[in-house]
A protein has these predicted regions:
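Residue-level signal for secondary-structure boundary elements
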Residues: 62-66, 88-91
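Acidic, aromatic-enriched beta-alpha/helix-loop junctions
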Residues: 31-64
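Metal- or metallocofactor-binding catalytic centers and their adjacent structured scaffolds
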Residues: 69
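N-terminal intrinsically disordered, cationic/polar leader segments
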Residues: 1-41, 73-94
Length: 94
């Protein structure tokens, strides 16, 4: 289960993301600009929905314990070049 909570309306937007899988729980502090969210979602989804999709994408590629504890969404493409291209599939999945 992925829980996304917005903790700041500033620039960039600031979130706490909690991932519960199996026995464990991880917490992540994630930032994302409004512009990045609009680009990733074609302005069709909320930032919270965008981050849920981001974490589903990441969890398909690595265990929750390997996801950075603190990061900006822009760094994901450094590790996974396919990120922006593939994210749409995760946004439209229920």
């Amino acid at each position: 289960m992925i829980e996304v909570r917005r903790i700041s309306e500033g620039v960039p937007l600031d979130f706490e993301v909690v991932v519960r899988e199996g026995e464990g729980v991880t917490r992540h502090h994630v930032t994302m600009s409004r512009e990045m969210c609009e680009r990733l979602t074609a302005s069709r989804h909320t930032p919270e929905r965008c981050l849920e999709a981001v974490f589903r994408f990441l969890l398909d590629r690595e265990p929750k314990e390997s996801i950075l504890g603190r990061f900006d969404v822009t760094v994901i493409s450094r590790y996974f070049p396919e990120f922006e291209r593939e994210l749409a599939h995760y946004l439209w999945r229920s």
